[in-house]
Each structure stands twice: as C-alpha cells, then as structure tokens.
Amino acid sequence: FDGRNTSANNKATDLMALPVRGCCSDPPCRNKHPDLCGGRR
C-alpha cells in the first residue's frame, strides 16, 4: 500500500507543482493549503 500511495502522491505533486508555487507565495492561499506548501516554516 505504501508504495502505491507514494507514487500516486508524487504524480499529484508533479501536476500541481506550478500552481502550488504561485499559491505558496500568496499568503491567503498558503493559509488555506498549508499541506501543499510544506506546512512547516
């Protein structure tokens, strides 16, 4: 199960990489999606 979840998460992360970068540089969006931006500062 872990292997499958990792590969699925990696694909989703790759697809979202560009929009997430824009979101993570936008404080309101980053606050709504802390998990996308690493969560930890």
UniProtKB/Swiss-Prot annotation:
Can you supply one Gene Ontology CC term for this chain's record?
Answer: host cell postsynaptic membrane
- Propiece residues: 1-20, 39-41
Q: Which residues carry this modification: Cysteine amide?
A: C37
Q: Show the Pfam families listed in the entry.
A: Toxin_8 (PF07365)
- Principal localization reads secreted
Region (Ser-Xaa-Pro motif, crucial for potent interaction with nAChR) location: 25-27
Cell location: Secreted
Q: Which UniProt keywords apply?
A: Acetylcholine receptor inhibiting toxin, Amidation, Disulfide bond, Neurotoxin, Postsynaptic neurotoxin, Secreted, Toxin
Q: Does the keyword Secreted apply?
A: yes
Give the disulfide map: C23-C29, C24-C37
What does the UniProt entry state concerning the protein's domains? The cysteine framework is I (CC-C-C). Alpha4/7 pattern.
Q: Family, per the entry?
A: Belongs to the conotoxin A superfamily.
Q: What is this protein called?
A: Alpha-conotoxin TxIB
Q: Which organism is it from?
A: Conus textile (Cloth-of-gold cone)
